[in-house]
Curated annotation (Swiss-Prot):
Compartments in which it is found: Secreted
Tissue specificity statement from the Swiss-Prot or TrEMBL entry: Expressed by the venom gland.
Cellular compartments per GO CC: cytoplasm; extracellular region
Protein's UniProt name: Translationally-controlled tumor protein homolog
Record's keyword terms, sorted: Secreted
Entry function: Venom protein that causes edema, enhances vascular permeability and is likely related to the inflammatory activity of the venom.
Domain of life according to the entry: Eukaryota
Biological source species: Grammostola rosea (Chilean rose tarantula)
Length: 173
């Protein structure tokens, strides 16, 4: 399994168990699903609930949302277009410092910066229609994932989470 982590904060953003694709070598798009889960609902294989003690009738607590957000404990945040541009300036600086720290060569950094700029140009016009998510630590210096709802040919919508490829590191487990 591959875990995609925020390069700056180390937060887990998603894993390769999610359906994803790379767009123009600069954005990773992850398809999400709406799910509802019962809290504390653990089913042990082979367990026979009819032979167990009767449940005490506790109130059932459920959580609903996007599978990726719930699984990775992503935290929703908000930006205006101007706030998002300011965030991108500070994030780009922090990212370049991180690239140096991990030993990227000048040519690799130049290519990564070019690809990052391409990615920003793709998402900036959509900022008003996007939702924003940070990693579990809620560190404002880290990567902010972008959620877009895309219309399908049958009229339904598919939630797609976008990540800047050059802000992620892969960890194989």
């Amino acid at each position: 399994m591959i875990i995609f982590k925020d390069m700056i904060t180390g937060d887990e953003m998603f894993t390769d168990s999610s359906k994803y694709k790379v767009v123009d070598d600069c954005i990773l798009e992850v398809e999400c699903r709406h799910v509802t889960r019962r809290m504390g609902d653990i089913q042990l294989e082979g367990a026979n609930p009819s032979q167990e003690e009767a449940d005490e009738g506790t109130d059932e607590v459920t959580e609903s949302g996007l599978d990726l957000v719930l699984n990775q404990r992503l935290v929703e945040t908000g930006f205006s277009k101007s706030d998002y541009k300011n965030y991108l300036k500070t994030y780009t600086k922090a990212l370049q410092d991180k690239w140096k720290e991990v030993g990227m060569s000048d040519s690799q950094m130049a290519e990564a910066k070019t690809k990052f700029t391409e990615a920003v140009k793709k998402v900036l016009p959509k900022v008003g229609d996007l939702q924003f998510f940070m990693g579990e630590s809620s560190n404002p210096d880290g990567l902010v994932a972008l959620l877009e709802y895309r219309e399908n040919s049958d009229g339904t919508e598919t939630p797609v989470m976008m990540f800047f490829k050059h802000g992620l590191e892969e960890e194989k487990v």
